[in-house]
């Protein structure tokens, strides 16, 4: 994003400490988040939001492609664990998606992820992302987790886990 002209970062109200830390490293100011922030910069959202699990407030703005110089990134770390469908479904064609299955697999110490580019990503943006890839060190354990994530057995296990999590949630609600 910085290489493409980003000059600021907007974050969800509740966000991971990694986000503002990375912004400081790149000397980008963190600006107050509003559903209307959308100009040049790096704009983060989470689906579902963390830690509340609610829908983000940016989906109306993010329904259309990002304007020039704006990078929209959706952190999908908790999406596989979402127990109910989102009230508002974001149009994922217009955002960079970051997925890490570590939380869904109960492997929070394993740091490995993958990105899905927006439909309108340019060949130059994709090449720039690939050029950065060597700086993202992923150990053999992370590679194994990402490879396992796509298997039918792991996806079946996840679906069975969601059934159990929904049952536990229903029990807690009744308390």
For the regions a language model picked out, list residue spans one by one.
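Generic structural signal for conserved hydrophobic packing positions in ordered secondary structure
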Residues: 19, 23-25, 43, 77, ...
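Hydrophobic/aromatic residues located in beta-strands of well-ordered beta-sheets
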Residues: 9, 72, 95-97
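PLP-dependent aminotransferase class I/II
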Residues: 97-173
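Conserved beta-strand elements of the Class I
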Residues: 8-10, 40
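Active-site phosphate-binding strand-loop segment of PLP-dependent enzymes
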Residues: 31-82
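Class I S-adenosyl-L-methionine-dependent methyltransferase catalytic core
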Residues: 14-25, 55-58, 62-64
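Phosphate-binding glycine-rich loop
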Residues: 1-8, 21-26
């Amino acid at each position: 994003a910085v290489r493409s002209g980003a000059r600021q970062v907007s974050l969800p109200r509740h966000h991971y400490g990694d986000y503002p830390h990375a912004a400081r490293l790149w000397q980008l100011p963190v600006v107050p988040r509003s559903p209307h922030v959308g100009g040049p910069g790096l704009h983060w959202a989470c689906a579902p939001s963390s830690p509340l699990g609610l829908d983000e407030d940016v989906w109306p703005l993010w329904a259309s492609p990002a304007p020039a110089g704006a990078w929209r990134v959706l952190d999908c770390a908790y999406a596989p664990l979402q127990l109910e469908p989102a009230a508002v479904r974001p149009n994922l064609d217009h955002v960079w998606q970051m997925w890490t299955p570590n939380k869904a697999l109960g492997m929070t110490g394993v740091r490995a992820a993958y990105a899905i580019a927006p439909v309108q990503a340019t060949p130059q943006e994709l090449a720039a992302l690939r050029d950065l890839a060597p700086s993202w060190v992923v150990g053999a354990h992370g590679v194994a987790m990402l490879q396992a994530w796509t298997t039918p057995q792991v996806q079946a296990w996840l679906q069975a886990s969601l059934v159990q999590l929904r049952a536990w949630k229903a029990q807690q609600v009744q308390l």
